[in-house]
Design a protein with these regions (language model features):
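Auxiliary alpha/beta "docking" domains used to position bulky ligands
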Residues: 1-138
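Iron-sulfur cluster-binding cysteine motifs and their immediate structural context
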Residues: 144-169, 185-213
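Short, charged low-complexity linear segments at domain edges
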Residues: 110-134, 158-180, 230-234
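Long, compositionally biased charged/polar accessory segments in the mid-to-C-terminal portions
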Residues: 243-258
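Gly/Gly-Pro-rich "capping" loops immediately C-terminal to redox-active cysteine motifs
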Residues: 208-228
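Short Fe-S-cluster ligation motifs
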Residues: 172-190, 221-243
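Immediate flanking context of iron-sulfur cluster ligation sites
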Residues: 131-140, 180-192
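Short, flexible active-site recognition loops that position polar ligands and cofactors
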Residues: 53, 57, 240-245
């Protein structure tokens, strides 16, 4: 029965264009873990690739809601909750347990088809579904990500988040001189793609889902936002992932990079 239910769920996910969907167990529950590829090509700009499309949280949540509704339709007494970014489990760990990828030296999860250019979402339900097993693939270990990191946050000994350009770009308040230099070196006002761009596993990464190839915006300039009130900023950019840390932070970063 649990294999049949699993097949129905995986087949349904495929029907709504989610091609990578597997099962992991978490605290006595089954997690239906899904990957959402977003790589739509490289283009000039000052925003990380993942922030080019409309806000992925909304897109993914809508897809996951369809899966949770489907689960409830085939198992009416079942509970099913959707999570994207914020949830009771580390999404990369769940995806690893579900056999959807392996860890790179940069800490990213790598899928054989998508590389590391994907978002992760999952549905926790109290069905007893057969879990998938982690895969045995390994990172090539070339060390290119170590060399490319603007802040030197990556090394054989681990990851230092305080030197990560992506973390710094989203850190509110006044930055230290060292943090400012790292941000300038990255060239981006929100996020960072340096370690992913040089990763050999991303060389043949599959293209994005349709939703992540539309309404693309690769950058903004200070003149775009400086005269806007916070409310106007929210109305204009509230449907973008880069807007969630607010206008003031983006202004600071834009001024630093000008």
């Amino acid at each position: 029965m649990k294999d049949l239910l699993k097949k129905k769920i995986i087949d349904f996910a495929a029907s709504i264009k989610i091609e990578k969907c597997s099962i992991a167990h978490y605290s006595g529950k089954s997690a239906v873990v899904c990957l959402f590829p977003y790589f739509s090509g490289y283009r000039e700009g000052n925003l990380s690739l993942y922030a080019h499309s409309l806000d992925y949280h909304k897109i993914i949540s809508e897809k996951l809601k369809l899966i949770s509704d489907f689960i409830k339709s085939i198992a009416p007494s079942c509970t099913a909750e959707c999570f994207c970014d914020i949830g009771p489990e580390v999404d990369r760990l769940l995806a690893y347990r579900a056999g959807l990828g392996f860890y790179g030296k940069n800490g990213m999860l790598i899928n054989s088809e998508y590389g590391s250019f994907f978002f992760i979402g999952y549905v926790l339900c109290d069905l007893n579904l057969t879990p998938d097993a982690p895969i045995e693939n390994e990172c090539m270990g070339c060390g290119k990500c170590f060399e490319a990191c603007p802040g030197g946050a990556l090394s054989a000994s681990g990851f230092d988040i305080s030197k990560c350009a992506s973390h710094i770009s989203q850190k509110k308040g006044t930055l230290t001189k060292e943090e400012e230099e790292i941000l300038k070196k990255s060239g981006l006002i929100f996020g960072c793609d340096a370690c992913q761009k040089v990763c050999p596993h991303n060389k043949e990464a599959c293209k994005a889902m349709k939703e992540f190839t539309e309404n693309l915006m690769s950058g903004i300039c200070l003149d775009d936002i400086k005269s806007l009130t916070n409310r106007q900023f929210s109305e204009k950019y509230g449907n973008r992932a880069f807007s969630w840390r607010g206008k003031k932070l983006l202004e600071r970063n834009l001024e630093l990079l000008s």
